Amino acid sequence: MQKYDFDLFVIGAGSGGVRAARIAAGHGAKVAIAEEYRFGGTCVIRGCVPKKLLMYASQYGQGFEDAAGFGWHSAATSHSWTSLIAAKDAEIARLEGVYQRLIENANVEIFKGRAQIAGPNRVTVTGASVSARTILIATGARPVMPPVAGANLMITSDDVFDLPVGPPRIAIIGGGYIACEFAGIFNGLGRHVVQLHRGSQVLRGFDDELREHLGDELKKSGIDLRLGVDVVAVERQRGALSVQLTTGDAMEVDAVMAATGRLPNTWGLGLETVDVGLDQNGAIKVDEYSRTSSPGIYAVGDVTNRLNLTPVAIHEGHAFADTVFGGKALPTEHENVPFAVFSQPQAASVGLSEAQARDRYSNVEIYGSAFRPMRAALSGRDEKALVKLVVNGSNDRVVGAHIVGADAAEIIQGIAVAIKARATKADFDATLGVHPTLAEEFVTLRNRR
């Protein structure tokens, strides 16, 4: 039997790669991992974690405003962008250390540098050439710039976390979750925000009613959301940026952020040397066990463009390690995965949208409610929450749940368990609610639309 330097070589130390390395090592495999940037990947370094820290920071302004309705009187407040970024940096450095220690404690050998596949079972990194029985690619994805003049003047979500100054006026291009989240962050921090989206509504792929409701709430929060419009060009003028629109209008801002999509990080990995198949967007094609078209090479996470969420990458990495090194054939599961958008207000979904359910089932029942949350009763804020259940009328099973409102992300996690367990509408009806809460609406919905 041929001998290799490692049983597994992982390229990329993000959430999926680190989980795969640790689990494989726990099964007794000799494992190495290579990372050219920082441990933790997109989620820890320039994604989910720092974004949510900024989201928390941005909510205090609204809290100060709402406090007056509850009898509080406070002096004028101000915000320090530099203090926020410094605190964020310290926390991210701490988490990066946690990730690296997890790898070290699992006795995984670490290579600092860019790894490339040099041929079957062969990887080069930092001048070294090593052999591995199995190679796992977990290199994630990167933001892409729109193909317009002046794109070099734009920033992306990667750049936002390191801005030396928070821009007073910012235009955000896009209608996906990243665009909506950063629009809420900058708006909450007191910046003037214009969100530009060429589509008819934000959050393509989500339930249509949720999309429309969130769009209305974003506008009411103070975001200048413009739909059906795109950017033609960006120019620097008198120390600011001039943004030319397809409507013929122009606006002046201090920063333009592109949040128009992400592409898999497959360039320069040497995939052509081993005939790893890619799709039209450059994502690595894999089967349900994360196997590529090349024997002995696997891929997990955003680089496969299956479902680009951190818990999904972790699940895929864990399933891969158990399958290849743990003797358990575990296909990856992508059904009923909950989604959360940390916009302001938050939006969250699990299961099928109403349109998807009607395409799949002949008998679909819809239950929903839009209402003013209790907090707004005294604050006077003009806002409405939305809850919605999608039910397969043939067997009463709840196949989709959607929510817009405070703590939607926390609420949908519990609802996801119920849907995963194939709960019926009768099960929801028989469950007592916690009163007074937004979440209780899911178990008190009675009127079918």
Curated annotation (Swiss-Prot):
Keywords: Cytoplasm, Disulfide bond, FAD, Flavoprotein, NADP, Oxidoreductase, Redox-active center. This is Glutathione reductase. Glutathione binds at residues 15, 99. GO terms for biological process: 2,4,5-trichlorophenoxyacetic acid catabolic process; cell redox homeostasis; cellular response to oxidative stress; glutathione metabolic process. Disulfide bonds join 43-48. One of its GO terms (molecular function) is flavin adenine dinucleotide binding. The active site is a redox-active disulfide bond. The active site is at residue 435. Pfam families: Pyr_redox_2, Pyr_redox_dim. It comes from Burkholderia cepacia. Its cofactor is FAD.
